Structure formats: structure tokens, C-alpha cells
């Protein structure tokens, strides 16, 4: 697993501290900070969810995640950006994905944050396996459109 403190994109198989990650993005140049946190919810498409598991092709996911963050750093007027995505079993209410972006101004931070989460969800090979309250389970693939 990557160390979330050393790369722009990381996978984590245990909970991580967003405060520490946020602090790593802040310095005297920063005038705006934007973040996104995605949490495991108890429902999807009309079904009650009791938990889920994220699986990834780790080497490819880390490489593609780094590409996404590199694109954001090149495309937007931002100072720094990081994204961490959990893998493994997660319970309802657990943090699944975090994105943080620092910039001199808020507009760039907000735009880059949205770009990063959208591109990570679209391009990074991470698969979600939901377990439902009725005992059924199902895979949701990154290439299948999901409701936001």
C-alpha cells in the first residue's frame, strides 16, 4: 500500500486521518482549500446496503490515480492536491474517499477538487462490492454510470 503522506494519490486498507492530510496541503501561500469526503451510505438504487468492499488492481490504480492528480496540478491554478481511497471491507458511515486541494484562490480549489473526484471515479480501477440487507450482493464497476 502507498503511504498517503508521500504521494498525491494513495490507497489505504485502514482508516486514515484527514486532519493530517489537510495539514500537509496548507502553507502561507494558500488562500483557499477545498475537500470532498465520500462516505459509505446505507442505501443505493432503492436497496438497503449493510456494508461494502472495495477492491483494486493496486499498481494500476495507484499509477492512474497519480496521473489524475498530475493532470489536476497542470490544468488548474492550484498549489497541491491529494486523494486517498479506501480498499477492503467498510461499514456504513466509514470514510471511503477523500480529496483535498489547496490554491491561492477558492475557485481553482473547488474546480480541481470536483475534477479529481470525477476522474478518479471514472478512470481508476477500483471496484465496489455492495452487500445488501436482503442477503444479496453485487459488484458496481467504475465504467458503469452511478447516480451522484
Q: What annotation goes with each model-predicted range?
A:
Residues 1-95, 104-114, 118-148:
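N-terminal, polar/charged subdomain of small-to-medium soluble alpha/beta proteins
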Residues 100-102:
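Short hydrophobic/aromatic beta-strand micro-patches
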